[in-house]
UniProtKB/Swiss-Prot annotation:
Its cofactor is Ca(2+). The active site is at residue 259. The keyword Nuclease does not apply. Belongs to the IUNH family. It comes from Dictyostelium discoideum. One of its GO terms (cellular component) is cytosol. This is Probable ribonucleoside hydrolase.
Length: 340
């Protein structure tokens, strides 16, 4: 594909296990022009999620290929920082059964992430004669994105947002709220009320994208076709198995949901989702329902509909996209002589 045929995106995430798979899907689906990567607090501290983004570039064979990681904000707009060690471990990318590579490149730390985001996104938009908007794929807290919109409001006509977060009915960090929204509800409110097109992939979709034995077998089959046992597949399965163990101990799930790649999958093939434009408000004051995405399913609100909410997913087609990307990554690593 020529560059002008690729879909321009910016990856903004709190790189944990499922964020790493979102990166893999984005880099190895061959339809994206990835303008940059920013880290943010969430699954772990921003220091750790920044390192994890760099590690993931090593794993997927994209380090030192011109893709920069810029270190984002370390805390929510109005609240104390929180992390999710019970799911992602002490590093945010724990993988006890396989040794992860060390980063060979450094992040950008001398300028605020939102400045870098603004410069790169606005340059692309201008150079492209305003023909293509850049889609910010947000799979962590929305603090970077909210601050970007607040400090550089002129960027709003240049972007859309595809995010993994929120829910229609239930939460995963409280009875009412999903984690990415709850860690910074004020930021989510800014983004949802920005006037920018927002695509929300909620828990109702991601809790159907389960990593079961059949999926693990399909991943194993990628290297079996070559009669090999590779460090890459060992890492991929190790990350998923650690994720599975923690979902079992925390939620008693038999299989873990691979949340974050869905925000990328929507951009690859929107037809695998059912989606509806609805009014969504963010609860920022209730003790019981803090961080809830209040989704107006029946158009009761008089306020303008503001979010394209995904309500269902074709799980088989999602996994076809994900397995194909893992296979593409595997082949890329061998062709580049990264895997021996």
């Amino acid at each position: 594909m020529l560059n002008e045929e690729l879909l321009p995106i910016w990856l903004d995430h709190d790189c944990g296990h499922d964020d790493a798979f979102a990166m893999l899907l984005a880099f190895h689906s061959k339809i994206f022009n990835i303008l940059g990567i920013s880290s943010v607090h969430g699954n772990q501290t921003v220091d750790k999620t920044t390192i994890n983004a760099l590690i993931t570039l090593e794993i997927i064979g994209k380090s030192n290929c011109g893709y920069e990681v810029v270190k984002g904000v370390r805390s929510p707009m109005c609240r104390p920082e929180q992390v999710c060690s019970e799911i992602h471990g002490e590093t945010g990318l724990d993988c006890p059964t396989a040794e992860l590579p060390k980063p060979t490149q450094l992040p950008i730390t001398d300028r605020p992430a939102i400045q870098v985001m603004f410069e790169k996104i606005s340059k692309f938009y201008t150079d492209n004669q305003q023909k293509q908007k850049v889609i910010i794929v947000a799979t962590g807290s929305l603090t970077n994105v909210a601050l970007l919109f607040a400090v550089y409001p002129q960027i709003k006509p240049m972007v859309e947002v595809s995010l993994l977060g929120g829910s229609i009915n239930f939460g995963n960090i409280s009875p009412a709220a999903e984690y990415n929204i709850l860690v910074d509800p004020e930021a989510a409110k800014v983004v949802f009320e920005s006037g920018v097109k927002v695509i929300m992939v909620p828990l109702e979709c991601s809790h159907k994208a389960l990593v079961n034995e059949k999926i693990l077998e399909r991943i194993s089959d990628i290297e079996k076709a070559d009669g090999k046992q590779t460090q890459f597949i060992k890492i991929i399965k190790g990350l998923l198995l650690f994720f599975a163990d923690n979902y079992k101990s925390t939620f008693d799930f038999d299989h873990p949901p691979l949340h974050d790649p869905l925000a990328v999958a929507y951009l690859i093939d929107p037809t695998i989702f059912k989606c509806k434009l609805m009014r969504v408000d963010i609860e920022t004051s209730s003790h019981l329902c803090l961080g809830r995405t209040v989704v107006d399913l029946f158009s009761m609100s008089k306020l303008q509909k503001n979010v394209h909410v995904c309500t269902d997913i074709n799980v088989d087609k999602f996994w076809d996209l994900m397995i194909n990307a893992i296979d593409n990554c595997y082949n890329h690593l061998y062709k580049s002589n990264i895997l021996k």
